[in-house]
């Protein structure tokens, strides 16, 4: 089985020109971007549920959570993790959008 780098080299060798290779890579990046946007929508829905349940927006929540003001409820750890995942995916989306 070929590793990823070998597959990329094979793809590069078999494309007729750089324009074709750029188009193929662009299509792959677009697929990844779509998946990331779908994940973001799920994270946003889940975060919104926490905000409604605790009547607190996520920015206020993060400040209070990091300051130790809130308790150790499992919900708070899940909410915080979702906020971190959301931030990470936003960075990835931004990079992909710049590349496309």
Language-model-derived ranges and their functions:
Residues 50, 54, 60-62, 75-79:
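Amphipathic, hydrophobic secondary-structure cores in small proteins
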Residues 1-52, 59, 91-100:
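Small, basic N-terminal interaction modules of short regulatory proteins
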């Amino acid at each position: 089985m070929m590793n990823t780098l070998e597959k990329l080299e094979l793809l590069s060798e078999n494309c007729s020109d750089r324009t074709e290779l750029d188009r193929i890579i662009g299509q792959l990046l677009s697929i990844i971007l779509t998946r990331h946007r779908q994940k973001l929508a799920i994270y946003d829905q889940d975060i919104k549920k926490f905000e409604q349940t605790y009547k607190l927006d996520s920015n206020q929540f993060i400040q209070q959570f990091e300051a130790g003001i809130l308790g150790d409820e499992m919900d708070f750890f899940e909410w915080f993790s979702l906020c971190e995942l959301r931030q990470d995916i936003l960075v990835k989306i931004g990079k992909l959008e710049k590349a496309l």
